[in-house]
């Protein structure tokens, strides 16, 4: 079967919005190639060997690729994509070049092409994210996590995930309960379990995410610790956690902040990321307004993570 690869050159800031445009157009899978995902290479020479050099050679900007089957309405879909991309700046997004190009490919070419950019990556002090299909010889102190995110979910190498992992390393102990909101591939819930949490719950609306996350939970043999649930945190979880982590987007974190306090134990920690730099103050103000105290702000590339706790705890 013939497919059309639609490639959009954009910015790190606009990657998620561009991917959503492609999904709305009916693409079968999205691949993201962003040189900013390897910004950590410059700061930690030990991780250099884990990075595919093809990413480092990219021209400035991120590439978002989606795949459409050849069909009678293909031209119309491409036009819709172009118009939708051109409209994104109206929402305050810097889309960079915003160039849209197409290429005819065979199904077998695109279904696994994204894997070539996903290599074992060390995050924080001890976590190593290893694709299930890659070989990796663990070093002393490494905590290896096996991941197969599928095409639709994060690999763990994005700045937002990296910052969340680094903060989880600080706050997880053997008696910790962790909630991971918008779990996707399940990576942060699994990290929590590997770091010693007694219980971790990952929540996601997407049934595909729930399936992928459960597969990764089994691959890491943490089924006795990690539970993946489909739905809204408020609807499917009735307990409280010591640590809640949400790697989503600023707008959703603002909404979550209205209720998150009721899901945190005394001295509970809320780790939020997926926040672009110019949204930091908006998120901080919402957290404080809803009874949380901001205790740390971390930035990496164009992204931020904010750590807060119940005020007065």
Swiss-Prot record:
CDD domains: AdoMet_MTases (cd02440). SUPFAM superfamilies: S-adenosyl-L-methionine-dependent methyltransferases. Keywords: Cytoplasm, Methyltransferase, S-adenosyl-L-methionine, Transferase. S-adenosyl-L-methionine binds at residues 161, 182, 204, 247. Signal peptide: none annotated. InterPro entries: Ribosomal_L11_MeTrfase_PrmA (IPR050078), Ribosomal_PrmA_MeTrfase (IPR004498), SAM-dependent_MTases_sf (IPR029063). Pfam families: PrmA. GO terms for molecular function: protein-lysine N-methyltransferase activity. One of its GO terms (biological process) is methylation. It comes from the Bacteria. GO terms for cellular component: cytoplasm. It catalyses: L-lysyl-[protein] + 3 S-adenosyl-L-methionine = N(6),N(6),N(6)-trimethyl-L-lysyl-[protein] + 3 S-adenosyl-L-homocysteine + 3 H(+). Its EC number is 2.1.1.-. It is found in: Cytoplasm. Methylates ribosomal protein L11. Belongs to the methyltransferase superfamily. PrmA family. This is Ribosomal protein L11 methyltransferase. It comes from Alkaliphilus oremlandii (strain OhILAs) (Clostridium oremlandii (strain OhILAs)). The lineage of its organism: Bacteria, Bacillati, Bacillota, Clostridia, Peptostreptococcales. The gene is prmA.
């Amino acid at each position: 079967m013939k497919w059309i690869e639609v490639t959009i050159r954009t910015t790190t800031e606009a990657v998620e919005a561009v991917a959503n445009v492609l999904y709305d157009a009916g693409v079968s899978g999205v691949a993201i190639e962003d040189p900013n995902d390897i910004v950590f290479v410059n700061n930690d020479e030990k991780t250099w060997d884990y990075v595919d050099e093809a990413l480092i050679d990219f021209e400035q900007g991120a590439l978002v690729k989606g795949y459409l089957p050849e069909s009678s309405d293909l031209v119309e879909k491409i036009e819709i994509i172009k118009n939708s991309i051109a409209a994104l700046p109206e929402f305050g997004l810097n889309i960079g070049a915003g160039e849209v190009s197409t290429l005819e490919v065979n199904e077998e070419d695109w279904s696994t092409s994204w894997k070539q950019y996903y290599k074992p990556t060390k995050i924080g002090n001890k976590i190593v994210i290893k694709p299930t299909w890659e070989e990796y010889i663990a070093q002393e102190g490494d905590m290896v996590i096996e991941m197969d995110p599928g095409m639709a979910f994060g690999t763990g190498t994005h700045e937002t995930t990296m910052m969340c992992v680094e903060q989880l390393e600080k706050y997880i102990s053997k008696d910790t309960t962790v909630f991971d909101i918008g779990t996707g591939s399940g990576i942060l819930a699994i990290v929590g379990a590997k770091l010693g949490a007694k219980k971790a719950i990952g929540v996601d609306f997407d049934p595909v995410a729930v399936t992928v996350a459960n597969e990764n939970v089994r691959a890491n043999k943490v089924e006795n610790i990690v539970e993946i649930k489909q739905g809204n945190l408020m609807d499917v979880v009735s307990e409280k956690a010591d640590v809640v982590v949400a790697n989503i987007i600023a707008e959703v974190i603002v909404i979550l902040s209205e209720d998150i306090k009721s899901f945190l134990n005394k001295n509970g920690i809320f780790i939020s990321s997926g926040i672009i730099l110019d949204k930091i103050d908006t998120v901080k103000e919402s957290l404080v307004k809803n009874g949380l105290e901001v205790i740390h702000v971390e930035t990496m590339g164009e992204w931020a993570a904010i750590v807060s706790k119940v005020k007065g705890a």
